[in-house]
Amino acid sequence: LVILVFVLNAFVFFLFFSLSHYLGKFLLVLFFMINSVAVYFVNTYSVIVDESMIGNVFNTNYEESSSYFSFKLILYIIILGVLPSVYIIKAKIINVTLKKGLTISSLALLLTIVLVITNASNLLWIDKNSKQLGGLAMPWSYTVNTSLFYIHKYKKNEKEILLPNATIKDNQKSVVVLVIGESARRQNFSLYGYDKNTNPLLSKKPNVFHFDATSCATYTTAGVKCILEHTNSDDLYEILPNYLYRNNVEVVWRTSNWGEPPVHIKNYQNRDVLRKDCKGEGCDYDEILLTGLKEQILASKKNKILIVLHTSTSHGPTYSKKYPPRFETFKPVCNSVELGKCSQTELINAYDNTIVYTDYILSSVIDDLKELKEFKSTMIFVSDHGESLGEKNLYMHGVP
């Protein structure tokens, strides 16, 4: 298979160089540079570069992407990207006659056919593992999947299908706080039987119920969209906040994250907006989402209120930087972006501390709601997806 991919790559780039020497060099340099970064992530985090991973790439921001920066990444870019690119730019192109070009192309195609026939007995295995194999074949893994990502994104950006209008039958003041977690897996919540006490506050709260849930995807946009949809469908139905806002419910979206599906409401508040009224250490962490929350609820002129808190608490790879120092309950912790360099204990300790901090945030929301005596209130917590913490050498969103 490696030889087959090599032959196909050689054939394709031979065609590019036949069209234009400059085009061929440009594409080779471009692909070597991108390949160097892709190979780094494949080797370091055991990711597969498929369509969902492309979704992760295009739904990131500077804060998240900068957290992956390391000396090892620079080495990969220099050795696998810059040095080959310099050689390609300086290399002299040898012109071949049309006859020789056709001969080379024919031989490449013939060799490809021979290799396919030779691997005929493995076709079932190849078909079964095509997604994983395709995600490792550079540069086609990211070129093909980027095209698929934008094709599917274009389809999803069509006009929303409106749901039937809601009928609100009472005037009782009610507020629901939906907290959307980031990369928080239930396996590490002591409420679900985890042997480390990661939920010291919630475990003491009355009327706290936990349930099993399975995410629809491993990147934020698809995961959050699935949470907010009324049904799992390829059709573009309006999501919960858009639906309730259209039906005269007060909807507030507060976020320290990014990548949510299109939210069509008036009160969308990101970290920059919330920071204006925030004071203290918590403003650098997800506590910022609680800034003035009670006051905003009380100031509403509507009886029905939905508050969405979109957190980023357990997002890697810098788990140890996602919570204030006082929440570092489990030690020692992993402080490196190269998670494979940390021991399993250090990595899990850092991640578990993010769950302890999540526990504090959720407990604080409950306490705030209890003070709103005139409101019936509910808090719901659900994460967009889980996380890989070195199991089978997989990290973060290791397997789509």
Task: Write out the residue ranges for each language-model feature.
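Juxtamembrane/transmembrane-helix boundary motifs at the membrane-water interface
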Residues: 1, 218-221, 342, 346, ...
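Transmembrane and membrane-interface helices of multi-pass
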Residues: 1-135
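A long, amphipathic alpha-helix that forms part
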Residues: 14, 134-140, 291-294, 333-379
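Short, motif-level signal for alpha-helix interfacial/capping segments enriched in acidic residues
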Residues: 16, 90, 97, 103, ...
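Catalytic cores of PAPS-dependent sulfotransferases
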Residues: 18-24, 45, 243, 247-253, ...
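Active-site-proximal alpha/beta segments of enzymes that process anionic O-linked groups
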Residues: 119-178, 183-335
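Active-site-flanking alpha-helical
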Residues: 189, 366, 391
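Histidine-centered active-site microenvironments of extracellular/periplasmic hydrolases
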Residues: 193-197, 375-400
